Amino acid sequence: SLGAEHLVATHGPPLSGATDIDERLRSYRDSIQFLWDQTVRWTNRGATSAELAHRVRLPECFGDDWLTQQHYGIAEHHARQIRTGLFGFFDGDPANILPLDTQDHAEHLIDAMGGQGAVRSRCEEALTTDVRWGLYLASQLAHHREASDEDRGLLATALRTAARRTPSANVRNWCITKALDVEGSIDMSRHRTHRLGRRQIAGWDLATSAGVLRVMIEPKKMKGADCHIAIEVEGERCGLHFRNHILCPTSGTDAPHTLSCTRATWDGLLTGSVTLSEALNTGAVTINGDTDAVISAFSALDHPAFTR
């Protein structure tokens, strides 16, 4: 609608020519509507998430332009994302209403198929004829309680096979990275823990930064806990109430305990560059109230700075 003669895209090549730009962007826009509308259509007809992945396919007319080819995401992922966003996690498949734990599922399935050896053989065969099935079987073997290095290697092979056959950079890069992960060739541990960076939290007020801690509670460590703590940092004040296996952000009013420190120290605690015990020992953190109760409350956090 702007009549632009040149378009620099966030994803994709630059375009020139007002008519060409208009036609190609219209096609791009229509491809998105197609995915949305057909996802809703098939969902209304009872399709599950897995079924949507195979029923909602972009027509051939969208396959001849870089803007609508599946170099980045893929249609089957978009369809499932649309469905989940509109209707929630349960897709109508009875198997998904009360699913087994991942490891339990793998062990039951492998046992039903004749054991790990039988499944390995089927997986190896499937990787030459049906990569999706092979990847699924390899994943189940790797989830098994008695998974071996051979099983993890088979999963890595399956992932690399899928990576070589997809046009999607997202899928390809994830599969290659996961293959390296399951082989132990790269350390992905930092992606499986809470991470807060100084630049990230520098612009947050105290209440926002303290409130983030609520999602780091380990419920098993909260049995019987009821500890309301005010946090005071350079003129700002908020509160954290450890109770009922949750951490409830408060204003700090009427809290019987107060933790005080500088903003630099507080940020250091959140980023893990200093621990609460170290800060208490150096005097960088002071506690007015029951010090042991405060330390015990904070130790319920799944965060290295507060773990006892």
Predicted regions: what they are:
Residues 125, 133-136, 143, 152-308:
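Feature captures hydrophobic
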Residues 31-45, 119-122, 265, 269-272:
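Solvent-exposed, amphipathic alpha-helical segments
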Residues 70, 74, 114, 118, ...:
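Alpha-helix boundary/N-cap detector
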Residues 105-140:
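Alpha-helical segment of the N-proximal tetratricopeptide repeat
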